């Protein structure tokens, strides 16, 4: 994941990670992954808050993850055991996602507030999952939207875009590159507007 972003940004962004865990939550995956009438994973907020409280007890200092100094942890990412709903026939599994939803947890007279979360699955169709879904969800945290049709069956760039189905190339082990638009959006590669008489070679 670190190398993916380093390459896509031409060395301008190299994320660093602190791995904490594993932790075991109090309920089964079906509780956290249960779908409602209009929303997937209606209890996902309980997943986040419980996992954050358990993780917070394993890491003494969270200040390194407060980039702007506002006293809030900017982002936490979870890899949960088993399959995700993106590749499972079980509707009660959790769908990989990024969520902006401030949550505070308390333990030992301490309060830690988290601004946003992301999560993805450990397994993909019975095998160890690659990095594609994690890269996709982290890209949401950086500001990129989905570029697949979230309400219908229209095709976009499909497997040619990391924010579409490109995160699933070779089961996530070889996610596609970011598009020129996405790199421009991130400020990593400025798009050049071509005039009608501009000569270009590919």
Language model features with spans:
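Active-site-proximal segments of metallohydrolase catalytic domains
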Residues: 1-110
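Extracellular hydrolytic enzyme modules, especially secreted metalloproteases
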Residues: 75, 81-202
């Amino acid at each position: 994941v670190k190398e993916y972003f380093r390459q896509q940004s031409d060395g301008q962004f190299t994320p660093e990670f602190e791995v904490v865990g594993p932790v075991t939550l109090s309920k089964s995956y079906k509780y956290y992954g249960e779908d409602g009438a209009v929303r997937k994973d209606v209890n996902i907020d309980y997943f986040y808050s419980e996992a954050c409280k358990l993780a917070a007890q394993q890491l003494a200092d969270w200040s390194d993850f407060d980039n702007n100094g506002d006293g809030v942890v900017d982002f936490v990412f979870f890899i949960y055991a088993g399959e995700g709903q993106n590749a499972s026939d079980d509707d009660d599994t959790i769908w990989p996602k990024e969520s902006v939803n401030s949550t505070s947890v308390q333990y030992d007279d301490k309060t830690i507030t988290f601004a946003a979360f992301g999560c993805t699955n450990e397994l993909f169709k019975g095998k160890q999952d690659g990095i594609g879904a994690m890269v996709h969800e982290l890209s949401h945290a950086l500001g990129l939207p989905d570029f697949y049709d979230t309400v219908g069956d229209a095709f976009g760039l499909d497997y040619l875009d990391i924010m579409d189905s490109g995160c699933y190339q070779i089961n996530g082990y070889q996610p596609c590159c970011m598009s020129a638009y996405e790199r421009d959006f991130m400020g990593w590669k400025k798009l050049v507007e071509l005039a009608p008489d501009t000569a270009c070679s590919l």
